[in-house]
Amino acid sequence: MAKAPARSTRKRAKRQVADGMAHIHASFNNTIVTITDRSGNALAWATSGGSGFRGSRKSTPFAAQVAAERAGVAAQEYGLKNLEVFVKGPGPGRESAIRALNATGYKITNITDVTPIPHNGCRPPKKRRV
């Protein structure tokens, strides 16, 4: 059986993006940080669960901070400088994720809350009785 000729594989150069957007989805159970370019194509993402936190530790502000740092470091190879931040959800990791992105070295130009608010849509879950 003949072997296929070996192709030379070179790592493709990452495209350079100056401005980007950071989408922070902070739920009660997890925090998802996605960094995209201006048109919404994902460059890097990280979650609290994927950062090594399991169970109730996923929903802590520190887990959100670690996830935001990981996403920020992964997106730095695209040459990002400025970030516009969109925050969605009521979770505990909202503020700490923004602070972590700021500490990673990005210039945050705008922070927008895009939490979906129903105009009396679905019935909310029943109240907990402990």
UniProtKB/Swiss-Prot annotation:
InterPro entries according to UniProt: Ribosomal_uS11 (IPR001971), Ribosomal_uS11_bac-type (IPR019981), Ribosomal_uS11_CS (IPR018102), Ribosomal_uS11_sf (IPR036967)
Subunit field text: Part of the 30S ribosomal subunit. Interacts with proteins S7 and S18. Binds to IF-3.
Role this protein plays: Located on the platform of the 30S subunit, it bridges several disparate RNA helices of the 16S rRNA. Forms part of the Shine-Dalgarno cleft in the 70S ribosome.
Gene3D superfamilies: Ribosomal protein S11
Keywords assigned: Ribonucleoprotein, Ribosomal protein, RNA-binding, rRNA-binding
Family recorded in the similarity comment: Belongs to the universal ribosomal protein uS11 family.
Signal sequence bounds: none
GO biological process, one term: translation
Superkingdom of origin organism: Bacteria
Protein name: Small ribosomal subunit protein uS11
HAMAP family: Ribosomal_uS11
GO cellular component annotations of the record: ribonucleoprotein complex; ribosome
GO MF terms held by the record: rRNA binding; structural constituent of ribosome
